[in-house]
Amino acid sequence: MHPPKTPSGALHRKRKMAAWPFSRLWKVSDPILFQMTLIAALLPAVLGNCGPPPTLSFAAPMDITLTETRFKTGTTLKYTCLPGYVRSHSTQTLTCNSDGEWVYNTFCIYKRCRHPGELRNGQVEIKTDLSFGSQIEFSCSEGFFLIGSTTSRCEVQDRGVGWSHPLPQCEIVKCKPPPDIRNGRHSGEENFYAYGFSVTYSCDPRFSLLGHASISCTVENETIGVWRPSPPTCEKITCRKPDVSHGEMVSGFGPIYNYKDTIVFKCQKGFVLRGSSVIHCDADSKWNPSPPACEPNSCINLPDIPHASWETYPRPTKEDVYVVGTVLRYRCHPGYKPTTDEPTTVICQKNLRWTPYQGCEALCCPEPKLNNGEITQHRKSRPANHCVYFYGDEISFSCHETSRFSAICQGDGTWSPRTPSCGDICNFPPKIAHGHYKQSSSYSFFKEEIIYECDKGYILVGQAKLSCSYSHWSAPAPQCKALCRKPELVNGRLSVDKDQYVEPENVTIQCDSGYGVVGPQSITCSGNRTWYPEVPKCEWETPEGCEQVLTGKRLMQCLPNPEDVKMALEVYKLSLEIEQLELQRDSARQSTLDKEL
């Protein structure tokens, strides 16, 4: 089929291909006619005409019979606010503009409901605002329940807006009377109890209250009144008197202990408390916490050293307590000597035990060997040792069958006079430590005298002059004892105060008030002219219950002992009670006198 001819024009084939498919869609047989129809339909929009006005949520046309579907440019339609809205602009119109659109300013806004007011014992929660369509919620304070609606909405009412539900009420929650308990009672006497009300329970005599003495009316599930906590019980509870070895009761004396009775403990000297010093009788008839233990923190029970005695003054006993580091010196009894050359001391160690000691062994006198003589009599002390001759033994002997002599075994293992012999010649005199003697012969002594002298720094103890008689020296050799200077001590004093001390003198350190001994409290002048152990120091001690106010200053701030404060308060309370009784007595006397008059 050939395309039609167009008068006075030319046919563009490309445009035909574009128009022809639409003509088929709309069932138009002539493409030219289809194009003309399409232009006619689009022409009003191009020229600015508007379609139907939009539907507004806040307003409606004043002419409710409006039926037109096309409006010319410049057309103005008047509107009125819908219920729940109020006019906010003087112009309430929509206008069709040249673009074919309806234009307008928002001219109606939500109306607002009045504030519902305060809810007594409750709260009003405004979610957004009080405008038309908004919702508020009501709730009651704890212990109150709500009567009425929990919500209310701002809605249209008559010609305005109002709340859909009135303000509710909050009523207080009530509890039934509290439960009764055996062997006890409560303080309440009402039929009902308001939320928050409390009652107190008490037990009959000889019964103890277990649990909380007071319970209160509370709320459950926002409306139900319940008592909390659970009511107590009244039981008979007693605890046995606790036994704390090496401990002492500070308070809480009594043969019987009931529920919640309290005992306060302290430990004896030399022991430290492990556990709680305060315990109370618990509901299970047991002490809570468990009674404490007193563990030793010092050395006790002095070691028993056979054939020895202690040098410390005053002499220690088995009941004494010694801190770690304490040094005690022992001395062998006459007739005994130290087993070794080590110091005869014991020291309290950190493990609270005394250092091992060697002890003392028997010191025997030698058997006399007499030339031209014989032992005529022997008196023995018979101790339990291996010695043939021991301290205190006495022998009598004769020389040349004419002269008779006697000798006694001394504590140092020598005979007095010196080892018995028959003859006029004396042996060399004994040498002494830290000293010497003057002699007239280098071989033997016959009716001679010697004089002992001590080295510098030592003093002679015993007879300085000895003479030889019948082969014996007139006396045992003296000793040179060391001299120790007075210990230098700051903030303390010595039990014996002098310029020099003779071995083995012992002194005790006593610190001034507020100072404590750091080191051994007892020291001894030793053979090398020094003090053993070293001289301790007296250092400042912070009193118990006090604290240092200024660093580097001995300015302390102390709090009173709680037990002293408690005792003072009890005494003050007793004085007030006595004063009250005296006033009552005087008042009774005055009343009696008035009646007699």
Curated annotation (Swiss-Prot):
Glycosylation sites: 221, 506, 528
Keywords: Complement pathway, Disulfide bond, Glycoprotein, Immunity, Innate immunity, Repeat, Secreted, Signal, Sushi
Domain Sushi, chain residue ranges per copy: 49-110, 111-172, 173-236, 237-296, 297-362, 363-424, 425-482, 483-540
Database matches in InterPro entries: C4bp_oligo, Compl-Cell_Adhes-Reg, Sushi/SCR/CCP_sf, Sushi_SCR_CCP_dom
Keyword set includes Secreted: yes
Gene3D superfamilies: 1.20.5.3730, Complement Module, domain 1
Subcellular location: Secreted
PROSITE patterns reported for this sequence: SUSHI (PS50923)
Tissues where this protein is expressed: Chylomicrons in the plasma.
Function summary: Controls the classical pathway of complement activation. It binds as a cofactor to C3b/C4b inactivator (C3bINA), which then hydrolyzes the complement fragment C4b. It also accelerates the degradation of the C4bC2a complex (C3 convertase) by dissociating the complement fragment C2a. Alpha chain binds C4b. It also interacts with anticoagulant protein S and with serum amyloid P component.
Record's subunit section: Disulfide-linked complex of alpha and beta chains of 3 possible sorts: a 570 kDa complex of 7 alpha chains and 1 beta chain, a 530 kDa homoheptamer of alpha chains or a 500 kDa complex of 6 alpha chains and 1 beta chain. The central body of the alpha chain homomer supports tentacles, each with the binding site for C4b at the end. (Microbial infection) Interacts with Staphylococcus aureus protein SdrE; this interaction inhibits complement-mediated bacterial opsonization.
Protein name (database record): C4b-binding protein alpha chain
Organism: Homo sapiens (Human)
Lineage of producing organism: Eukaryota, Metazoa, Chordata, Craniata, Vertebrata
Gene (name only): C4BPA
